């Protein structure tokens, strides 16, 4: 996951936002950390912990943005698999057999096993860790939207502080207009 990120999007097609919304409703409310870093700039956003904080549409957009931005390579995957093989807790025969299956599948994304699903009941989405710092703001906006409130937002900050990056993300998530004050020569 740390190498390929949400790679299964390319093979399965993009799930609609309703898919995440329904999964959020089904996910048990557990005391899990909101996010868990998995390396390479990615984290798992636990849907179990996000109830009533972010809208499914917001999570969906963060997930899609991550899938577009994070393009791991086969060489990176092979490098990580070599590290895993050299440090595996499994026997050399088991490790070699699993790696051979993966190679024969042309390195298709791997799903969680049934025993894993039964033991952990995972409900998460992979997102870029760079989005985490925006969660307090996204939560406030989503809360207003969930209550039917219109929202107008002004972003102020120093030069190169990330205002344009944040505005672009907000525009993507909420399909809103962005007006850059720099364009008005005040």
Spans of features found by a protein language model:
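N-terminal pre-Walker A segment at the start of P-loop NTPase domains
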Residues: 119-146
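Active-site signature of alpha/beta-hydrolase-fold catalytic machinery across serine-
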Residues: 169
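Long, basic/Gly/Ser/Thr-rich N-terminal segments
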Residues: 1-113
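Hydrophobic positions on the alpha1 helix immediately C-terminal to the Walker A/P-loop
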Residues: 166
